[in-house]
Each structure stands twice: as structure tokens, then as C-alpha cells.
Amino acid sequence: MDDITAPQTSAGSSSGTSTNTSGSRSFLPTFSNVGVGLKANVQGTLGGRQTTTTGNNIPKWATLDQANLQLWTGAGWRNDKTTSGSTGNANDTKFTSATGSGSGQGSSSGTNTSAGNPDGLQADKVDQNGQVKTSVQEATSGDNLTNYTNLPPANLTPTADWPNALSFTNKNNAQRAQLFLRGLLGSIPVLVNKSGQDDNSKFKAEDQKWSYTDLQSDQTKLNLPAYGEVNGLLNPALVETYFGNTRASGSGSNTTSSPGIGFKIPEQSGTNTTSKAVLITPGLAWTPQDVGNIVVSGTSFSFQLGGWLVTFTDFIKPRAGYLGLQLTGLDVSEATQRELIWAKRPWAAFRGSWVNRLGRVESVWDFKGVWADQAQLAAQAATSSTTTTATGATLPEHPNALAYQISYTDKDSYKASTQGSGQTNSQNNSPYLHFIKPKKVESTTQLDQGLKNLLDPNQVRTKLRQSFGTDHSTQPQPQSLKTTTPVFGRSSGNLSSVFSGGGAGGGSSGSGQSGVDLSPVERVSGH
């Protein structure tokens, strides 16, 4: 497939660029047609009018002032309390400390109205039942609230061009790095336990399924969100989140009862201690001019976002089980926050994602870090001198740590329960109960073969011709698992993708793993 390195003009010409093998003109993503993260999503979704979410008894979402989108924090500002009824912020670090916006402390008293501080938004708080609260005090107290107090409408979608932008990182190219950034920043995979339980417990440690044993017994137990989804909600503007209570030192058990995210939780020196991770995304209505100074070095690239210099290490071609994000404050006066490190090795490393013809996000994850961490914890538990009955055991290494999953929305987590009288009980009507669950996880050598097929020029060329109806060959197609291949087209100002795929032959195997049907995605021609 020909290498495309320069964007084409609206007339279809390009500078030093050849057409793709299909013979049809393609339009490369440019800074004008790659979505601008949160701002483009909000404007395109709400369009200056009220939007109603699906489900019974769900209130309309008030229209956002498009001139003040910087006040909206998307997935929300988490303000967990130390104990029930406590008025303090258990996590200490304030929103303004992480973002540099405003000068207030983000107290729950409602007196702070600094720009960028979501605690100053008194009309954008929603409880678990979807009821809008009119004051900060109402929205940050009580047991029936979600941990996120500023959640977006459930129908927000990521930028339409992010699958295309993602594919442009296969070359160590600064333009492609920025295309990737523009289309994907704000869709960083964040693995968070589901919230909004009926019993108001919000987060449960047992909801986090990462063990190799669970994968063997039931592949659908893995609590993996699709790319850029948190609790089934897209993550366009999650600015800061916390690990919550971490596991006690040497115990090897996860004692998280408040939020836990799927990156490696560091061991702490004592019980009930907390640590945090800061995620910088386009939540404050950033524009193309806000992102600059992109530097590509080896397998890493850096860029400036507002007052931060963000560096992705080993991101263009990540090592197994390793992904680093370094945030460096450009304001030298903030010595204590000059450098923040995201977990260098998450529990699962993202390997690729696409959208099938049904609109479902399919992705590949690397679990080497998961099982390595578990083996280390098991070994520590077995040799711990503080435990008299230590029974740790190293988990067996999986023969292939790549896991393929098709994600779908768990309908049972978003439905209204009915009482005996036929009346609808609204306790389960929260739009935040959408939860993405893996439909199937493939972890066999069949996946390896399918990924290799993606890189086979002959396979790519053949499938592209078939997609455009130019290949009349009767050559039988390989029966191994095929992954998707994007082709760039133009549709109503955005890019559309053509994905090829087929089913994995052979049906179900004795291990309970069956083939995955990846039907071709049809090309959209909306112009």
C-alpha cells in the first residue's frame, strides 16, 4: 500500500502524494477535518438545543453555553469524601492544582466560582437517579450520588475521525503524531470500576476482573472498557481521577472501596493511604492553536497543551506492558507539580482499536503487565513475614498475552425496574449505568495470525479491491481471523473508514473459544 505523507487539497490534488491502491481519491485527515475533541463533540451533539437521553424518567440536559465550554469538565470532577458525611476532600489535590485554571480551592460550599472549576457549576450536578441538583451542596452530599458530579450526556461520541487518525501513527512522523493527538486525545483508555450500583456502594473492588483464572473460566468477566470509555461513557474530558484507597503493604489484596482505576496501584507504606494519577485531556475547550511544539523522538512524542508539556513514552510503538505519560508543568513557580508521572506500566496495554459495521468498538489489549503484577504480588504474599498462613502462588503465564475483545453495552445495567404494582422504580434509571463489557476475548495463536494478515500487503490490496468492487478474482479467502484495515474517504466533512474482515474459521474450539466474525464495514458516501 502506498505511503501517504502529505494531505490532499479539496480538489483532490496533493503535494508528493500518490493515490491508494483502490484507485479512488482519498482525503487525508487535516487539522480542519479531524475533530477538535470536546469542543467539537459538544457543539455537534447539543447544537444549541436541549437533548434528551434514552430511558424512562430521564430529564433533559440543559443546553451548554458554547461560549463557556471551558467550564464543562465532561466526565466530571471526582470529589470523594473520606467518610460518610465528611465535608473535606479526601484526596487533597484540587482541580485547579492539576489544571492551573482559576485560583479557587474548589470547596464544596458553593462559594467558589472560578473559571474551569466544576465545583463552581451550580446547575450541572446530577445524582444517581438523573435528577439535576441546583446547588453544589446538594450535589456533593448524600449516599445516592455517583462519584462523578459533572457527567456528559450519554450520547456524546468521540471525534468521528479518531480511527483514521490512529492509523497514522504507524510511521514515526510528526504530522501523523499530531493527527493521532488531535483525533485521539481525550480518548485515552482509562480503566475504571463501574459505578452507580443499586446499593449505592458506587465502586467495588470485586468488579475489577483482571485475573488469568477468570479469563480461563469466563472470558466475559474481564472488566475492560472499549477504547476511550469509562463506565460505558466516552471520556472526552476526564481531567483528574484518583486511585482511592490502595491495597495494604504486603497484603497483595486490593482494598479499594472508592474509585480504582485499572493502572498499576503502587504499594503504600500503610493502610488506607491514597495515591493519585492525573490525566490531561482537552477538557478545557482547547483549540488547534492550544496544541503545539510537537516533538517526535524515537518511539515517544511530546506536545504542549496549555501550561503542560505532555510526553507519551513508548507510545508510538509501546513495549509489552509499558506505557508512560509524563506531564511537566511549564510554570516554574509550581515546583511541587513540575513533574507528574502517570503509571508507567498499566495493568493492560492498549494495542489497537477500530469500529466494526455495527458501530461496536473492537480492540486488542496486552495482558503481560497484568499477569506479571499478579505473579509478583502472589510471590510477595507467599514470602511475607507478617502473615503466618501465607498461601501465595505464582499464576501461570498465558501463552499469548494478546486479548481480542468485542465490546457491547450491558443492557441490564441500564433499565428501569418495576414494582409489583406496575409502577416504575426510578432508582436504576441513571444514564451513568451504561457499562461496556467484553463480548468475547480471543487469546490464541489465531489472533497472531490475524494481526499478521493486517500487515500483509497482498491481503490489504485484495481486500481494498473487494471493498470497492474492483476485484473479480475468485481466489478463496484465508480462513484465519482478519482484522480491520482503514481506507480514507470523505463524507460530510469528516472521514469515513472502510474496514475489511472475515470470520475466524473452524467454529468453537475445545477450549471454549470461538471464532470472531468481523464483517466488512460498508463505505459511507454522504456527499
UniProtKB/Swiss-Prot annotation:
It comes from the Bacteria. Disulfide bonds: none annotated. Residues 82-95, 128-148, 468-495 have a biased composition (Polar residues). Residues 500-513 have a biased composition (Gly residues). Residues 1-26, 76-148, 248-269, 468-527 are annotated as: Disordered. Residues 9-26, 108-117, 248-262 have a biased composition (Low complexity). It holds the Pfam family Adhesin_P1_C. Belongs to the adhesin P1 family. This is Putative adhesin P1-like protein MPN_500. The lineage of its organism: Bacteria, Bacillati, Mycoplasmatota, Mycoplasmoidales, Mycoplasmoidaceae.
